[in-house]
Amino acid sequence: MINQDDFRSALGKYVTGITIVTCNSKNGPIGMTANSFSSLSLSPPLVLWSPAKASKRHDTFLRAEKFIIHIANEDQIELCKSFSNSADGGDAVNWEFNNEGEAFIKNCSARFECIKYNHFDGGDHSIIVGEVKKFETTDHKPLVYWGGAYTKL
């Protein structure tokens, strides 16, 4: 049997980017900090992310037909921490809205506006695949996660 703490520690040796995934809910926009993001396909343009099933926000994201994945910039540590603790991001977030009424966060390194393409079971997580309909990039350096902590490049 694999020790989960040791497994998590080993996974922490892999540097990942940090994202904030947002969607609209019946109570307004919500978000979740996630490092389980990956590109999947160029044609069609697909990305994926994996929310934990134990999260109170999991089911809302699983039902969402649209969502936006934000690549956090190196100055957005507090924003990422806020979304780790609160669905609405607390006072740290200033919501903006696109033409379709979807909430997003400005000044990220990149932003991918997606429609849900599919979802799959992934153990204690779900795997949500999104088809990218629009994206935007900036010159901001991304925030990264390594060894269980946020860090800069």
Model-derived features with residue positions:
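Basic, polyanion-binding surface patches
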Residues: 1-153
